[in-house]
From Swiss-Prot:
Keyword hit for Transferase: yes
Family statement drawn from the similarity comment of this UniProt entry: Belongs to the plant acyltransferase family.
Record: active site: H171 (proton acceptor)
A biological process term (GO) from this entry: secondary metabolite biosynthetic process
Protein purpose: Acyltransferase; part of the gene cluster that mediates the biosynthesis of abscisic acid (ABA), a phytohormone that acts antagonistically toward salicylic acid (SA), jasmonic acid (JA) and ethylene (ETH) signaling, to impede plant defense responses. The first step of the pathway catalyzes the reaction from farnesyl diphosphate to alpha-ionylideneethane performed by the alpha-ionylideneethane synthase abl3 via a three-step reaction mechanism involving 2 neutral intermediates, beta-farnesene and allofarnesene.
EC number of this enzyme: 2.3.1.-
Name the record gives this protein: Acyltransferase abl6
Top EC category: transferase
UniProt key word Secreted: no
InterPro entries: CAT-like_dom_sf, Plant_Fungal_Acyltransferase
A Pfam family it matches: Transferase
GO molecular function terms attached to this record: acyltransferase activity, transferring groups other than amino-acyl groups
Key words of the record: Transferase
Length: 495
């Protein structure tokens, strides 16, 4: 697919502040600074307005009035530690307003059709596997900017009258929740500006936006601040299997010192696939695992992650490509700490779970893995998360995207479920496809809601099925699909 970039504009809030403003980002959020969120693409089959680019650019600027920090730039500074040591630590700072560069809005066009980028036959009542390698979305991704740049948006018009919105931003400023919050507000504002509709039922529940970088750290200061309690917090934090910028893998104890910086890992060498599970198939898999464990603590998403983890381990064993892989699973502070729903930022950590020694049968049993995941996540209580924040406050924030990359092969799973993509509409049109543009590493599984193709009489998030985006070596993927547990997954095309 050829895409022609017609123009590029710097984008700022509609009511941009005349003077610059700055804020020190939370320490936990800063662990993800200088990484971009996984760029998402929203594809629409039509636009009802006369000026696609102008309309979207205007509504984007208006939306940034509530999210001005997302158009800011990042840099590093040193601050004094609040103790008697006089020690300073490196922190990440965001600057917005004034003469800052802002974000980027790219206008592009292509002679391709939106439907050419969709699976040959999308039917939510069936489960399928689709090789996306010849349906690359990479040309729809915003052009590369310096790592300190703000939000990036590329709007691409298609020959058929449809359009695509590609979106990414710095991960320290926005986790998946914040991305969903932002696109939800943009959708609502755009619809109010450019349609005659007076009611917006899907956007009524949008929370007010809140930028309060010290919100979580204030919770730490509200706890017992005696020396003994602080040492207990440090011990607790360091006993947890939490991934840090200087500890990227459980097998690595290297620190960010001297010449131990390494270049980023090589890009994915695998093939991008989409696995779609129908609602009934998703329920069959997850309920089977939940019933086998007889534990009410095992949620449907934990059960499904354990299913995928076990299937990947079995596939790797069939291909003789290595031992069972570790699982890295993000856990958010938002719900455990009761953070405001409209709080923007990236308050999360990744939890590392052992894949087990080579040949261990239990690591191909999803029931065992579901129990391991649940018991590990149960350790991340409110007190544990506050301990992690305190421990992080004594460390430097990353100086750049170059950080320790000592790691072994692993599975990573992240969920985009529940962040409102099924409620979006720009004008009168809802997206016909939402997904990541690229998968930067192999064994990364991204789960999202299936797209609506018909009415579903259910309130469950997977009422239209569940989509899993993943990049795997072709032989591993073939072995994965040979698993009897995936017998109901239909192959689309020749993979």
């Amino acid at each position: 697919m050829k895409v022609e970039v017609m123009s590029s504009h710097r984008v700022h809030p509609e009511h941009k502040k005349a003077s610059e403003e700055t804020a020190i980002l939370p320490v936990i959020d800063s662990w993800y600074c200088y990484w971009r969120t996984l760029a998402a693409i929203y594809l629409f089959d039509a636009y009802s307005g006369p000026e696609l680019y102008t309309d979207l650019r205007q509504s984007l600027s208006k939306t940034l009035d509530d999210f001005p920090q997302l158009a800011g730039t990042l840099d590093n500074c040193n601050i004094q530690v609040e103790d008697k040591s006089g020690r300073s630590v490196r922190r990440t700072r965001v600057t917005w307003g004034g003469n800052t560069l802002g974000g980027e809005f790219i206008e592009a066009k292509t002679n391709a059709r939106v439907r050419s980028l969709l699976p040959p036959s999308i039917q939510n009542i069936s489960s399928f596997a689709w090789d996306r390698s010849d349906r690359t979305l990479r040309p729809l991704f915003p052009a590369t900017l310096p790592e300190t740049s703000g939000i990036r948006v590329q709007v691409t018009s298609f020959k058929c009258g449809g359009f695509g919105i590609a979106l990414d931003m710095d991960h320290a400023l926005a986790d998946a929740h914040t991305v969903g919050l932002f696109i939800g507000h943009w959708s609502a504002i755009h619809t109010r500006m450019f349609t005659s509709t007076t009611t917006f039922p899907s956007q009524i529940s949008l929370p007010n936006v809140m930028f309060n970088p010290q919100f979580v750290e204030k919770k730490v200061h509200e706890t017992d601040n005696t020396y003994g309690s602080k040492m207990v917090m440090l011990d607790r934090a360091r006993e947890l299997p939490t991934r840090r910028p200087d500890l990227r893998d459980k097998s690595s104890q290297r620190t960010m010192q001297g010449n131990m910086f390494k270049p980023p890992p090589k890009p994915s060498a695998g093939v991008p696939y989409l696995l779609h599970f129908s609602a009934s198939e998703y329920e069959r898999i997850t309920r089977g695992i939940q019933q086998a464990t007889a534990s009410p603590q095992i949620t449907d998403q934990v059960a499904f992650v354990s299913f995928l983890w076990a299937a990947l381990n079995k596939a790797r064993a069939r291909c003789s490509v290595g031992q069972a892989v570790d699982l890295h699973l993000p856990t958010s502070f938002r719900w455990t700490l009761g953070l405001p729903e409209g709080l923007i930022g990236s308050p999360l950590v990744a939890v590392m779970m052992d894949g087990g020694p080579d040949g261990e049968v239990c690591y191909t049993d999803p029931v065992v893995l579901a129990t391991i995941i649940t018991k590990t996540l149960e350790r991340y209580t409110e007190d544990a998360l506050l301990a992690i924040v305190y421990d992080a406050s004594l460390r430097d924030s990353p100086a750049s995207m170059l950080r320790g990359f000592e790691r072994r092969e692993r599975m990573e799973f992240t969920s985009g479920v529940g962040f409102g993509s099924d409620k979006l509409s720009f004008g009168c049109h809802s997206p016909v496809f939402v997904g990541p543009i690229i998968l930067p590493v192999d064994n990364l599984f991204i789960m999202a809601e299936g797209m609506r193709t018909s009415e579903a009489h259910s309130s469950k998030w997977y009422k239209h099925g569940a989509n899993i985006f993943v990049s795997l070596p072709q032989d591993v993927f073939r072995a994965l699909l040979a698993d009897p547990a995936l017998i109901n997954v239909e192959l689309l095309g020749d993979i």
